Amino acid sequence: MTDSENESTETDSLMTFDDYISKELPEHLQRLIMENLKGSTTNDLKQTSNNSEFNVSKNGSFKGLDDAIQALQMQSVLHPSSLGSLATSSKFSGWSFAQGFFVGQLSIVLLFIFFLKFFIFSDEPSKSKNPKPAASRHRSKFKEYPFISREFLTSLVRKGAKQHYELNEEAENEHLQELALILEKTYYNVDVHPAESLDWFNVLVAQIIQQFRSEAWHRDNILHSLNDFIGRKSPDLPEYLDTIKITELDTGDDFPIFSNCRIQYSPNSGNKKLEAKIDIDLNDHLTLGVETKLLLNYPKPGIAALPINLVVSIVRFQACLTVSLTNAEEFASTSNGSSSENGMEGNSGYFLMFSFSPEYRMEFEIKSLIGSRSKLENIPKIGSVIEYQIKKWFVERCVEPRFQFVRLPSMWPRSKNTREEKPTEL
């Protein structure tokens, strides 16, 4: 066979696109339809083949694409049960999918609207009263100190009531005489003595605070210390919270002002205990800024994260500070490994107890920024939640009837504490 004959044969085997549309495609459609109907309804197709009214040409093929479409219409009329079930199931499945999709989207939109309305864009609540400490089951002899902070008194417990707690009448009278003698020799009458300004005390406190600020900011010591502390506490954080990092820290540049100091008997103590009432006022800008991320751990850990930046500032603090002295006779050490010397020092030491009145005033300035691209700024609800938690932490530790105490160092002169001034270089 020559090359010209091969080329003519290949040319005859090719088909134009118009011929495929008018001849080959209808035949393919016919075969597909017939195979589908034969597989589903064999008996009906046998009866249909005898009574068929299709207009088929002598060579068994449809005349064009119009004949194929006409055949589909006729088949749907003659056999509605075979095609109707398929159409009904498709319609039902399509409607079920659309219905579920619509309900799912609607629920997400409603949940998002509820979150925005009641959590993010809700109005900031009016200034409510300060949180109150929870009731405690341990009450002391004096009603002004019925609570003891467990976090600061972990190494101390009350002694046995029968052996050490109750003072006999002779010891009580001796204590009353000591208080009266102190007031007499210091020319102080708790009933008529005017309040003092404490200007000299403010100067001393200001020097101490200034020294603390200088040491804190030397080579960013306080910033590194806080970040290290938070890093050690990271395993205790909840799973939905990422590592917390301090981004801003300001220790302020002002000093607290103490004033209106007066000495009085502790309420409900039967004139057996003295305490000092001091008004304190701080108008400064103490700031702490942190950043973290809220993690979404479903369906797999860390699938999404929401950046959060918070800056909390205390701009005003006013309160009445109560200060009193007490010895260690009401407490006993629970440390088993302490030496006898330490035990003697614990029993003979004195403690400075302090607390704040419930009528304190603490004002905050809270800034928040949530999101990475589309950011929500200064959400009132977040500010109110943070403010409430800070006040709650403060009330549960330092607000009456709870108190804190600091052990006073021994005032007895010791050689290891002796110092002398360095000679001035000329």
Curated annotation (Swiss-Prot):
Glycans are attached at N6, N50, N55, N59. InterPro entries: Mmm1 (IPR027537), MMM1_dom (IPR019411), SMP_LBD (IPR031468). The keyword Endoplasmic reticulum applies. Residues 1-100 are lumenal. Residues 122-426 are cytoplasmic. Residues 194-409 form the SMP-LTD domain. It is a single-pass type I membrane protein. Belongs to the MMM1 family. Homodimer. Component of the ER-mitochondria encounter structure (ERMES) or MDM complex, composed of MMM1, MDM10, MDM12 and MDM34. A MMM1 homodimer associates with one molecule of MDM12 on each side in a pairwise head-to-tail manner, and the SMP-LTD domains of MMM1 and MDM12 generate a continuous hydrophobic tunnel for phospholipid trafficking. The SMP-LTD domain is a barrel-like domain that can bind various types of glycerophospholipids in its interior and mediate their transfer between two adjacent bilayers. This is Maintenance of mitochondrial morphology protein 1. It comes from Saccharomyces cerevisiae (strain ATCC 204508 / S288c).
